[in-house]
Structures are given as C-alpha cells and as structure tokens.
Curated annotation (Swiss-Prot):
Family recorded in the similarity comment: Belongs to the CTL (choline transporter-like) family.
Residues linked to a glycan: 20, 209, 284, 488, 520
Subcellular location: Membrane
GO molecular function: transmembrane transporter activity
Species per Swiss-Prot/TrEMBL record: Drosophila melanogaster (Fruit fly)
Keyword Cytoplasm: no
Any one GO cellular component localisation term in the record: membrane
Protein name: Choline transporter-like 2
Short name of any one Pfam family annotated for the protein: Choline_transpo
Taxonomic superkingdom: Eukaryota
C-alpha cells in the first residue's frame, strides 16, 4: 500500500472520471504541435528544392561511366578520352542478374563507336581477306591489334582473349554496347541459340565458341544474320522463309528480354558460384562447394511455385489463426505454449535416442573434404546428440518454469489478446494497412537514393596517376616519363588526362626520341570533389530520409492506435462504425501530423547521432587506442538504449494522443505516468503478450516449414529436388516475415488496449455512472464488475 502511495505521489494521481470523455470519438479536437508540423513541411520544401537542384545540375553519367578491363573510365581517363563506349568481348557472360554484384567475367575495352556490323571469326576466317578481317577486329588495345600480321596471329590473339572472337551489330545503351536486334532478325536465328531449355554446354556453342559440331549451323547463322541486320524496319516485299517453322515468340517481343529471362532460369550461373563460394567458407573442397551451390540454385529455381503456394497458405493460416483467436484465444494460446513444450520433449527424446544408438554403435569417421562427409561425421558423433539433448532440455525447463511462474499473468494476457483479436477481427482492414506503409517506405527510399546519386555527381572529377595491376595482382613497372606541363606528375599524385596523354610517354631508348604512349600507367578517375554546400546537401538528404521514414512509421502506428482505441472506448461494440480505420486515418492526418512529426524528429536526431558514431568508429579502426574504443563503445551503447527507450515512449505517446488529442509532450507525460503507476502490470503483461505472440509466430512458422517438408518428401514425383531443405528454409523465412506482419498489428492492438485498460481501471469504478469499458472476462480476472440496470447492460 505504501509503495502504491509513493508511486501515486511521484507519478501523479489516478485519472478521474469525466462524463464528457469519449476517447478518440470526441469532436472537439484541435491540431497538435502545429509548429513542428510547419517545420516538417518547410523541411520537405527544402528537400524538394535540393532534389530539383540536384537533378538540374547533377549528371548520373559521371557515376555510370563504364570501366574497361584495365580499370580505365571510358571517355575520362588518359588513353581513352575519345572512346566513350564500352565493348564486351562476350556479352553472353554479362546477361546475368548478379552482374551488378559479381561483375562481368569477359574482357571489356573502350571504343569510339559500337560495332555497326556482325563479325564471326570462325565463319569468316576462310571467306574474307586478312585486311578485311583485321579491319573488323576489336582488341584490348591498338598496340595488340598493330602486332597482328597474319590470320594465324589473329587466331592466336583470339585464343588468348586479346581480341573478340565474335560480335553482333550493337548500339550504345548507358554507354555500353548492347546487341541491336530488330524483330526481323528473330526469324533468322537458329533455334539452338534461343531454346529456353538449353544447357550450359549448348550455351558454349555460341558463335564465339563454335566447334566442329555446330560449324554448319554457325555458317547458316552468319549468312542469315548478315542479311537480317539491314532489317531495322521489316521490308514490305515478300517475306523470306525463316530457319524455324515455328515463330519464336520471346524473341519477337524482344530478344534481349528473352535472353535475360533465360539466363535467370539457368542454374549454372554466377548465383550458383556465389552460393558455392559462401559454402566453401565453411568447409574444405571448393569443387564440391561449387557443385552444392549449383544444386541449391537449381532447387530454388525449380521450387519457386511451391514456395509461393506455401507462402499463400501461411497467409491464409494466419488469417484463420486471427479469426479463431477471437473466440478461442485461450485454447489457441495455451496450445501454442504446449505445442512448443511438446516439440521440445520430442526433440529431447529423439536426441537421447540418437545418442544411445551411436554410443552403442562404433563407427569409423569418413575421411573426406566434401560436405556430405562432414555432415555424416557430425550426425554419427554421439557427442553431437548429447550436447543437442542438453540444449533442448535446458530450453524446455526454462520455458516450463516461466509458464508456471507467470500462469496468473498469462490469464490476463490471454484476455488482452482476446480483446486484441476482437478488435482486429472487427476492423479486419487493419491487417492489410501495413501495405500502405510499405509503399510509402519504398517511395521514400527511392527518392532519397535518387537525390543522393544526383548530389554525388555534382562537382569536378579528380584524377590520379596510377599504375595498373597484373592478373596476379602485382603492380606493373613502366618507364613512363612526363615533361612540359606534366613534369611534376608522380604516381599517386593528381593529374589531368588531357595533359597526361599529350606529355607523358614511354622512352624506348636514351639516345633517340622514340616514344610510345604509356600503357601500364594512366591518369585515372579517382573521385568527384563535391563542393562543401553539396556535402551539406547530402547530409540534409540523409537526415531527411531518417525523419521521413520515422514519420511514416509513426503515422501508421497512430492510425492503428486510434482505430483500436476507438473500438475499446465504444461501450457497445456493435456501435463501432464500419469505416473506423478510414476515420482514424483522416483524424490523424487532419489533427495530429504535428505530433507525428515531433516524435519522429526526436528519433531521427538520435538515429543520426548513432550513424555519426558508427562513421567515427569506422574511421578510428586504424588507430588501436583502447581509451577511444571504450568511449565509443559506451556512447554507442548509451544512444542505442536511448533510442530504444524513446521508441517505447513515442509509441505510448501516440496512443495517448490518439485517445485524448493532446500534444506530444502532454501525451508522453500522461502515458509515462500511467505506466509508472502500473509498473508491475506493464512489465509483466507486456512481456507475457510478446512471449505469447512469439510462440504463435513460432508455431505458424514451424507448421509451414514442416508441412512443406512433409509434402515434398512424400511427393517426389511432383517436383525433382536435390535438397528438400532448400525450399523448406525459404518457406520458413518467408512464413516468419508474414506472421511478423500480422502479429505486428496485433502487438499494436494489445499495446493500445492495454493503455486503455489501465485508464479504464483508474477512471471508472463499475457504477451506473462510471461503468467499465473492459470485457467481462477482464473484469472477472480482476474481481470487478459493472453494476448496471438490465437495460443498460451490453453484451461482450
């Protein structure tokens, strides 16, 4: 009792009854935190001004300038000043979804213009003269091309990847030379090049890798494609007979699009290699890792339909789970708890059984460097199962003790969860409201990235004199001498490409003035020197994204809080209006955007401080100073705790603002005092409900994963897989994300109803003048009841 009085004196008196109080339904609301809203609007106006300035003065071409195999920026670096386009020796290697991440594994060279004709060495070498062939060659450098004297030299240069084996009429796109196909060309390309199901071996049978097996087909292709290149616009005269009788629909739409789709469906791609490289970090045996990566990607490609169906079923199951919780909240939540406990018991039994089996069954370890051998050794080791059984047993005991100790609080949590399920089911549109937030988030991210890129392109480019690296990673050595205006140029120093190209060269002899251009030393693009005002604009853009993203999240939260509070403070639930979410949306948008802007501004400032600390931490990593590391660690920890606390405070402030319509500071103070006056209830019930929601998500996720695994394991004829665990893992991850969205709405509902419940307990006493708004179940658990005349009673 003394403790309650102390809390009451410290955090204010309990709320008093107000007969005019109607919660979010009150009509005498006024706009809150208007100055902060005006500040936010002005800030957005400044952001828009920066955006238009960046778009008008920025040039994304500076950031999208292609780089050749020698790390020279086409059209910018010395030696390639007049060569602004990038040519790929084998464009087939570049049509891959992961090329932006992994790069294009083919020689690339800067050219003045993209090739305007087709060249196929394997077909043309015996049909044209050396001079004609030499004129069509595209090589790594003009020096390589100048050293070619015969057709044999051409063959050697092509075999050594110094010159392109083949190319097709191309056009520049973002300064990259891409194939220029017209629809007429599609009629003349053999089907073996466009068959959607062709294998990797068939891919290597392109003109650039022609073999004896396809020499005849390559001849036909060259002849037909040479004739077809002129068909930029289909001719009006008689149509020639195509190579294939059936039309190639994908090619008709667009050949490049068809090739990209096909490449995305191939399994032996860079994605497989990337997965294989990731796996290779965990065990020895690179070849096996690459094979495993190929199989994993193959399973992902083949099982995408199963994954989508499983995700849809998870979504439906979550909705059914929500609907059932409205009437069967207690059984379902207890089932979730006991389901996890039973699952842990089964895990203990299986682990102990496996431990006893392998303890009594001596085995010889399989000596191998592949993954299969490693996994087999681990599973046949009795200690593995011993440690696993101990871990699962500890988890079982901890969860069981928590359930026993918190069983009384769990009853109240179940009642609150039931209230939340009623509220969500009553306004089912709240479940899909997060989609609105996602759309706004995506738009904010796209806008911030776009503005950032344009801002980053404003400024003068800086160049440095560098030496190229060999294939083995060693620095090249070259006697590159500069004179005249470039006499002070040094490796690593700044330079100008035009001056470098004119006054820097390799001295062949010390007695004669014979010089050649520097090949292994270049004046290369280093970075763009942004003016100081542009750097501040970039900082403004980063803060703008933080503020806007927190604003979107806060707005969404307040709309949901207003919806659920409106439901709670409606005495007769059948009187809840149909468009509750819509009314809450417009009420928040009209009256409380200033409060949303205020709360999001506070979080944005704290997050910006955290980002600055992370930046300082990265910069100071090279200085091994224990004191600096300790200070930074303490500051990072402090601001992380501060942001976590402010998020908690903001959420409750938004709820109180949605209920009472007060400004941010008043709402934050009221919610904080209300929580502190009921501190034990808040801590216990909040944690219990979070725990129950986590168990429910775990149950749905485990059910989705187990169902997927069981279906695939018992129906092998439906889909052919190497590892059933691959699609199962994807389904588990997707299911957890889906359930997190649904239970995120639930969490908002419970948080809102809980504050309403606490206020209801303080404001009302159950008399006819001051009836409780809580459900009968909650009143029964708390030992309270409404003393109402029969005609004033309501059904719960």
């Amino acid at each position: 009792m003394t403790e309650s009085v102390e809390l009451m004196n410290k955090y204010g008196e309990p709320l008093r009854y107000d007969r005019n109080f109607t919660g979010p339904r009150q009509r005498d609301r006024s706009c809150t935190d208007v100055p902060c809203l005006l500040l936010f609007v002005l800030f957005l106006g400044g952001w828009a001004f920066i955006a238009q300035y960046a778009i008008r003065n920025g040039d994304l071409n500076k950031l999208l300038v292609p780089t050749d195999s020698f790390n020279r920026k086409c059209g910018m670096d010395s030696g390639v000043l007049n060569k602004k386009n990038l040519f790929f020796f084998d464009l087939n290697q570049c049509i891959d979804p992961l090329v932006p991440i992994t790069g294009c594994d083919t020689p690339q060279v800067c050219v003045e213009t993209c090739p305007r004709e087709t060249f196929v060495w394997d077909t043309m070498k015996d049909k044209q003269s050396f001079a004609e062939l030499h004129s069509r060659l595209i090589c790594l450098s003009e020096e390589h091309k100048a050293q070619i004297r015969t057709k044999s030299d051409i063959q050697d240069a092509i075999n050594q990847n110094q010159c392109a084996r083949w190319y097709i009429k191309s056009a520049p796109f973002l300064k990259r030379c891409l194939f220029e196909f017209s629809q007429g060309v599609c009629d003349y390309i053999p089907s073996f090049l466009l068959n959607g199901g062709r294998s990797r071996r068939e891919l290597h049978m392109l003109p650039g890798n022609a073999t004896t097996e396809v020499q005849m087909q390559a001849d036909v292709m060259y002849q037909k494609m040479t004739d077809a290149q002129a068909l930029v616009v289909p001719q009006a005269n008689g149509k020639q007979t195509p190579v294939d009788e059936e039309p190639i629909i994908q090619c008709k739409r667009r050949l490049n699009e068809a090739v990209i789709k096909e490449k995305m469906m191939q399994t032996d791609t860079r994605l497989a290699k990337l997965v294989g490289n990731m796996v290779a970090h965990f065990y020895n045996g690179t070849n096996d890792a690459q094979l495993l990566g190929e199989k994993i990607v193959e399973d992902l490609v083949n099982s995408w339909s199963i994954v989508l169906v499983a995700c849809f079923c998870t979504l439906v199951a979550s909705l059914i789970y929500i609907a059932l919780m409205r009437w069967l909240s207690a059984p379902i939540l207890w089932f979730s708890i006991f389901g996890v406990l039973i699952g842990l018991l089964v895990g203990i039994y299986f682990s102990v059984k496996q431990y006893i089996h392998w303890e009594n069954t001596p085995t010889v370890p399989v000596h191998g460097l592949n993954l299969h051998s490693t996994v087999k050794n681990v599973l046949q080791n009795q200690n593995t199962w011993l440690y696993l059984s101990i871990f699962v047993g500890v988890c079982f005991v901890v969860i069981l003790l928590l359930v026993i100790v918190l069983r009384k609080r769990i009853r109240i949590a179940i009642a609150l969860t039931k209230e939340g399920s009623k509220a969500v089911s009553s306004v089912i549109s709240t479940v899909f409201f997060p989609i609105f937030s996602w759309i706004l988030f995506i738009a904010a991210i796209a806008f911030a990235i776009g503005v950032g890129l344009y801002l980053g392109s404003i400024g003068d480019p800086s160049f440095r004199m560098v030496r190229q690296l060999t294939k083995s990673g060693e620095v090249t050595t070259e006697d590159c001498v500069c004179e005249g205006p470039a006499i002070n140029y040094t490796v690593g120093g700044s330079c100008k490409p035009e001056v470098f190209q004119q006054y820097c060269s390799v001295r062949l002899t010390s007695f004669f003035q014979n010089r050649n251009p520097c090949l292994n030393t270049t004046c290369s693009f280093d970075s763009i020197n942004n003016p100081i005002e542009i750097k501040w604009a970039i900082f403004y853009n980063v803060f703008g994204f933080l503020w806007l993203s927190f604003f979107i999240s806060a707005f969404s939260y307040m709309v949901l809080a207003s919806t659920f509070a409106r439901w709670y403070w409606t005495f007769k639930k059948r009187d809840v209006p149909y468009f509750t979410l819509t009314r809450a949306f417009f009420q928040t948008a009209v009256y409380h955007l200033g409060t949303v802007a205020f709360g999001s501004l506070i979080l944005a400032i704290v997050r910006l401080i955290r980002l600055v600390l992370e930046y300082i931490h990265e910069k100071l990593k090279k200085y091994d100073n224990a004191v600096t590391r300790a200070i930074l660690c303490c500051m990072r920890c402090f601001f992380w705790l501060l942001e976590t606390f402010l998020k908690f405070l903001n959420r409750n402030a938004y709820i109180m603002c949605a209920i009472h319509g007060k400004n941010f500071c008043s709402s934050a103070a009221d919610s904080f005092n209300l929580i502190m006056r009921n501190f034990l209830r808040v801590v216990t019930l909040d944690q219990v409900t979070d725990f129950l929601f986590f168990l429910s998500k775990l149950l749905l996720t485990a059910g989705a994963g187990a169902s997927t695994y069981y279906f695939l394991d018992n129906n092998p004829s439906i889909i052919r897989l190497n590892y059933i665990a691959v699609p199962t893992t994807v389904v588990v991850i997707a299911a957890f994300l889906i359930t997190s969205v649904f239970f995120g709405v639930y969490s908002t509902a419970v948080d809102t109803l809980f504050l309403c419940f606490l206020e209801d307990c303080e404001r009302n006493d159950g008399s006819p003048e001051k009836p409780f708004f809580m459900s009968k179940q909650l009143m029964k658990i708390l030992g309270k009841k409404n003393n109402l005349p029969p005609r004033q009673r309501r059904g719960k």
